[in-house]
């Protein structure tokens, strides 16, 4: 065979163990000539490119079939279609009428989608996007182009979000994409249920689908309260049609795992429970459970007394904005597992002295100071998209405020508006997408720390602009009565203290009283209404960020009265000891906001 003037002899070698058996295609060849074996990696690619060119609308050469879908006609070669698609192979090699037809109509696939898939058969290239994936996947399934189907599944897996995961789960179930179905279900139930339960997709679920979610032992919720709230919200979304399903849903709410106060104040007072005898029985079961001594509760064994065992997602610590030494936009995260800091998307504008919280899967940066003005704007970070967006602004400008999440509301507490300290408090309702005032505190407080324990919001210390004094007083807000009341004072005055909650107790770390910057730490126990001292921090800190994770309390950055700090230390209550983490932030930050978020997968 003559190719480009060269005589090529092909030999095939079959190796088995240590023996080599040689066969030759040329009977006249002898063992002295080793021959040449070659394989072209571009040969098939070139062949398919040429065939694709031959079928183009301008040429239509050697085509032997015309595929028709709606108004779209696609010339093609049977042998190419059959070699890549089992669907076409069965069509053209069997006894079907299409095997001899020049025109073949393809039903259940729109023309443009069919064109994309035929283009893929010839080119091995296809673009999957949000706009086409829902038509591309079922069409690829029909033509049995399994590589394309898998690419569509992989794409949808990367798009999973609390707002769409239930829809993707239903789509995967419809098209028998078992791996994607499992991934979407795990995402919704085992990773992000608290965020999913407030979305529109959850409210549109069927009874069977809701039961499937809330019955899972691996459901990821901070407390069983979230499951009860999700169930009540789903019923009330279409009360007339869904009220009859209340007992069925209550089977899967583990009421005995709720606190006694929550059972009495919330569950027992819920009208849906009061008016349903079967649901009352579940409440009585929970009350009996709590009446037993702790060492006897294991004697009651039902599905509702079994604790859930959620899969723990890796967490990262997010430090938002701050002063370094002026207001900055940068945001960095600390990976606890890898002991490293890394940058994520910057804030849209410079922001320090803001309130930062995590709510429903997003991080909120509330108010603050942009370097020239106190602001009332609010930016929201979506970790899955690594993007910031804006929501409606607060009604008042606030910097050095406290921010916390209680129930379904985000509270902005006190602060400084540029001329005076504030006692006012407002709350953001994400469902209504609006801010509203609630009862004001009894004292003006800027540089205030806040925390939530057992359904109550606490405002700790701060600075009273009227008396020009740092404060030791603490106030407690009851959202049911919409009232603030004083609780026990701290042992020392603290403005700019880092406030956090760990194991149901409120910590106040550092802060200052006039020029004196503190490293002392005290802890408030709401059950006894008392404060106690714990071990001092390693460094004096004020205006530091605080967060709690894995039974440890972290204090991040701040300043010592002369310079900003880049170090982070954590408190272990079991050892009553503070320790520094090995790696500092990229630069010193005071007045930064801190939150713990799920590590983006």
From Swiss-Prot:
Residues covered by the BACK domain: 165-268
Kelch repeats: 316-361, 362-408, 410-455, 456-504, 505-551, 553-599
Swiss-Prot/TrEMBL keywords: Actin-binding, Cytoplasm, Cytoskeleton, Kelch repeat, Repeat, Ubl conjugation pathway
Listed pathway(s): Protein modification; protein ubiquitination
Molecular function terms, GO-annotated: actin binding; ubiquitin-like ligase-substrate adaptor activity
Cellular component aspect of the GO annotation: Cul3-RING ubiquitin ligase complex; cytoplasm; cytoskeleton; cytosol
Stretches assigned to the BTB domain: 63-130
Pfam families: BACK, BTB, Kelch_1
GO terms of biological process kind: distal tubule morphogenesis; monoatomic ion homeostasis; proteasome-mediated ubiquitin-dependent protein catabolic process; protein K48-linked ubiquitination; protein ubiquitination; renal sodium ion absorption; ubiquitin-dependent protein catabolic process
Location relative to the cell: Cytoplasm, Cytoskeleton; Cytoplasm, Cytosol
SUPFAM superfamilies: Galactose oxidase, central domain, POZ domain
InterPro entries: BACK, BTB-kelch_protein, BTB/POZ_dom, Gal_Oxase/kelch_b-propeller, Kelch-typ_b-propeller, Kelch_1, KLHL3_BACK, SKP1/BTB/POZ_sf
Keyword set includes Cytoplasm: yes
Glycosyltransferase as UniProt keyword: no
Protein family according to the UniProt entry: Belongs to the KLHL3 family.
Quaternary structure and interacting proteins, as annotated: Component of the BCR(KLHL3) E3 ubiquitin ligase complex, at least composed of cul3 and klhl3 and rbx1.
Role, per record: Substrate-specific adapter of a BCR (BTB-CUL3-RBX1) E3 ubiquitin ligase complex that acts as a regulator of ion transport in the distal nephron. The BCR(KLHL3) complex acts by mediating ubiquitination and degradation of WNK1 and WNK4, two activators of Na-Cl cotransporter SLC12A3/NCC in distal convoluted tubule cells of kidney, thereby regulating NaCl reabsorption.
Protein name: Kelch-like protein 3
Gene from which this protein is expressed: klhl3
């Amino acid at each position: 065979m003559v190719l480009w003037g060269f005589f090529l002899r092909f030999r095939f070698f079959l190796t088995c163990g240590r023996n080599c058996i040689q066969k030759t295609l040329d009977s006249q060849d002898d063992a002295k000539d080793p021959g040449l074996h070659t394989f072209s990696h571009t040969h098939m690619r070139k062949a398919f490119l040429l065939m694709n060119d031959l079928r183009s609308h301008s040429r239509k050469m050697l085509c032997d079939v015309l595929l028709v879908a709606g108004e779209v006609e696609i010339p093609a070669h049977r042998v190419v279609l059959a070699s890549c698609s089992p669907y076409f192979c069965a069509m053209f090699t069997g006894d079907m009428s299409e095997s001899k037809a020049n025109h073949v109509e393809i039903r259940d696939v729109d023309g443009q989608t069919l064109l994309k898939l035929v283009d893929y058969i010839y080119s091995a290239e296809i673009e999957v996007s949000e706009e086409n994936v829902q038509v591309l996947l079922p069409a690829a399934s029909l033509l049995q182009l399994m590589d394309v189907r898998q690419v569509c599944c992989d794409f949808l897996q990367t798009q999973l979000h609390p707002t769409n995961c239930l829809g993707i789960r239903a789509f995967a179930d419809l098209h028998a994409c078992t791996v994607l179905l499992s991934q979407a279900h795990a995402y919704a139930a085992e990773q992000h249920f608290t965020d999913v339960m407030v979305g529109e997709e959850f409210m549109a679920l069927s009874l069977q689908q809701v039961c499937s979610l809330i019955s899972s032992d691996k459901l990821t919720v901070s407390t069983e309260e979230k499951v009860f709230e999700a169930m009540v919200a789903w019923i009330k979304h279409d009360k007339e049609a869904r009220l009859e399903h209340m007992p069925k849903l209550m089977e899967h709410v583990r009421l005995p795992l709720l606190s006694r106060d929550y059972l009495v104040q919330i569950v027992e007072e819920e009208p849906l429970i009061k008016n349903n005898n079967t649901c009352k029985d579940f409440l009585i079961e929970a009350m009996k459970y709590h009446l037993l001594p702790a060492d006897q509760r294991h004697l009651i064994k039902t599905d509702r007394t079994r604790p859930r065992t959620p899969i723990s997602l890796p967490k990262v610590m997010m430090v938002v904005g701050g002063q370094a030494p002026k207001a900055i936009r940068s945001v960095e995260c600390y990976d606890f597992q890898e002991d490293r800091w890394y940058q994520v998307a910057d804030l849209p504008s410079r922001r320090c002295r803001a309130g930062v919280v995590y709510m429903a899967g997003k991080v909120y940066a509330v108010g603050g100071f942009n370097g020239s003005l106190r602001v009332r704007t609010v930016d929201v970070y979506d970790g899955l998209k690594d993007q910031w967006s804006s929501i409606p602004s607060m009604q008042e400008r606030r910097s050095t405020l406290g921010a916390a999440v209680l129930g379904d509301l985000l509270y902005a507490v006190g602060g400084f508006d540029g001329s005076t300290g504030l006692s006012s408090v407002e709350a953001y309702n994400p469902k209504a997408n609006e801010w509203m005032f609630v009862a004001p505190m009894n004292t003006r407080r800027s540089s205030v720390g806040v925390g939530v324990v057992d359904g109550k919001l606490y405002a700790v210390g701060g600075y009273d602009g009227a008396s020009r004094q740092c404060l030791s007083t603490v106030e407690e807000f009851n959202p049911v009565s919409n009232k603030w009341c004083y609780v026990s004072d701290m042992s020392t005055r603290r403005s700019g203290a880092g406030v956090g909650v760990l194991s149901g107790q409120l910590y106040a770390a550092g802060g200052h009283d006039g020029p004196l910057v503190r490293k002392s730490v005290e802890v408030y126990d709401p059950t006894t209404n008392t404060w106690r001292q714990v071990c001092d921090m390693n460094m004096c800190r004020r205006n530091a960020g605080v967060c709690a994770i894995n039974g440890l309390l972290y204090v991040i950055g701040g300043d010592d009265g002369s310079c900003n700090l880049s170090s982070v230390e954590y408190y272990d209550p079991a050892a009553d000891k503070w320790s520094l983490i090995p790696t500092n932030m990229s630069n010193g930050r005071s007045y930064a906001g801190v939150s713990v978020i799920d590590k983006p997968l």
